[in-house]
């Protein structure tokens, strides 16, 4: 877990609109963020893992679009993105191993709730986890 503060020495202009106030915080840099990884291997051929990423609130630019009439600096919500994987190994020949695995990415389905829409949307107004909750299965063959 990391706590840091990214500030400009002097408030910075970020919009071409002179009515938009400058900001002293750097955009897209949360003050608090971190990750964790846990792995459990009860037997040599079976494993489970749990990973996660936390991103605290941050300031992002939301430029003039179909949703907002002027450029604004938006404070995002925090996000927690967790992933789970389970794997089982099988020896199919003396030097060949087959692994079957599966899991869930973005376990809690964390995502941005306020996307812009329409032809005049701000395509740069994207933050938070990129993938929705996803279930996957895999096969790995190793020598």
Predicted regions, residues:
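Short, local alpha-helical segments
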Residues: 65-71, 80-89
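Transmembrane beta-strands of outer-membrane beta-barrel proteins
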Residues: 34-36, 48-50, 84, 98-102, ...
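Surface-exposed coil/turn segments at beta-strand junctions on protein surfaces, enriched
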Residues: 29, 41-43, 75-77, 91-93, ...
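C-terminal beta-signal and adjacent terminal beta-strands/loops
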Residues: 54-63, 88-143
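Flexible, active-site-adjacent loop/turn segments at secondary-structure boundaries
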Residues: 24-27, 77, 105-106
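Extracellular loop and loop/strand-boundary signature of outer-membrane beta-barrel proteins
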Residues: 15-25, 68-74, 122-127
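Gram-negative outer-membrane beta-barrel transporters
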Residues: 1-63
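Residues that define the transmembrane beta-barrel architecture of outer-membrane proteins
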Residues: 30-34, 78-82, 96, 131-135
């Amino acid at each position: 877990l990391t706590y840091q503060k990214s500030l400009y020495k002097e408030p910075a202009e970020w919009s071409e609109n002179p009515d938009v106030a400058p900001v002293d915080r750097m955009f897209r840099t949360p003050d608090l963020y971190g990750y964790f990884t846990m792995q459990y291997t009860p037997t040599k051929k079976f494993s489970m893992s749990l990973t996660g990423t936390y991103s605290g609130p941050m300031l992002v630019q939301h430029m003039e679009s179909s949703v907002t009439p002027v450029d604004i600096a938006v404070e995002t919500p925090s996000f927690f993105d967790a992933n789970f994987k389970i794997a089982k190994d099988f020896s199919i020949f003396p030097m060949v191993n087959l692994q079957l695995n599966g899991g869930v990415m973005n376990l809690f389905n964390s995502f941005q709730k306020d996307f812009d829409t329409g032809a005049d949307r701000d395509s740069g107004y994207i933050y938070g986890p990129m993938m929705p909750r996803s279930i996957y299965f895999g096969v790995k063959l190793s020598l």
